[in-house]
């Protein structure tokens, strides 16, 4: 599945005037600005007529009045990858990168995502939805220690706590509930942390190389993700070939199950006791910073950051456009 990306010719002129949506008003604004800045520079280097656009500073209706032909969504978190901006772009009739309205909304909600994956028979850790510190303590009793407590609809490990004792439950619940009234308690899978990007859509969706993540003392938090160099990323991942292929198969199935398109990145834990992979979540607007993982995975198969950005942009589409043809001459979303 990761043998190589399909060969494609992209007519830069056919892309038209492009808005790189960045910033926004979520808790991940700072990271979004870094992602968007990198994408903007890469697209301009390839001759694309690309411009920065911050939805928290300008009304989205200006995209139409200013003649933008498509959008590269580099927004993270609420209003950027939860179906909100995707719905607005559908109404404006401006094609955009990444999954559509429904897939974006579902993937942003970790609980709904896990329910669908579980229904489809895909492996994901056991969980509880809680609404109080007392319920969090009960979840710890049910799921065992350690346990992960996190907001249902945030990313970048924001609001996340690894709980190892009942005394931590109240503080963990309070932190998570600051970001979302729906708090997820999830069984902790002891083992190796990996992540794997997916590009394409439907039968054409394909996984990129798996990345194995080794964080200091297992602490892969917001700071270590974006602002330090202490976390180690292994790509090639160094896993047995059969394990990597199984992870790639699993993430493509998870991607298709949620009806994603364009691109996404799924996080997986490999349980140490039996080497079984478990899906944690899927990110439908992955980071594109200097520390980000999709560009790292693409580089491992010979695809540069600039080429990756161009390919993602060329696949911009709309839910409402059946049979649309993109700048690479491929059919759009069905």
From Swiss-Prot:
Pathway: Cell wall biogenesis; peptidoglycan biosynthesis. Its main location: cytoplasm. Residues 114-314 form the ATP-grasp domain. It is an enzyme of class 6 (ligase). It is found in: Cytoplasm. It catalyses: 2 D-alanine + ATP = D-alanyl-D-alanine + ADP + phosphate + H(+). GO terms for molecular function: ATP binding; D-alanine-D-alanine ligase activity; metal ion binding. Keywords: ATP-binding, Cell shape, Cell wall biogenesis/degradation, Cytoplasm, Ligase, Magnesium, Manganese, Metal-binding, Nucleotide-binding, Peptidoglycan synthesis. Gene3D superfamilies: 3.40.50.20, ATP-grasp fold, A domain, ATP-grasp fold, B domain. Mg(2+) 1 binds at residues 267, 281. SUPFAM superfamilies: Glutathione synthetase ATP-binding domain-like, PreATP-grasp domain. InterPro entries: ATP-grasp, ATP_grasp_subdomain_1, D-Ala_lig_Van_CS, D_ala_D_ala, Dala_Dala_lig_C, Dala_Dala_lig_N, PreATP-grasp_dom_sf. Binds 2 magnesium or manganese ions per subunit. Cell wall formation. HAMAP family: Dala_Dala_lig. This is D-alanine--D-alanine ligase. It comes from Paracidovorax citrulli (strain AAC00-1). The gene is ddl.
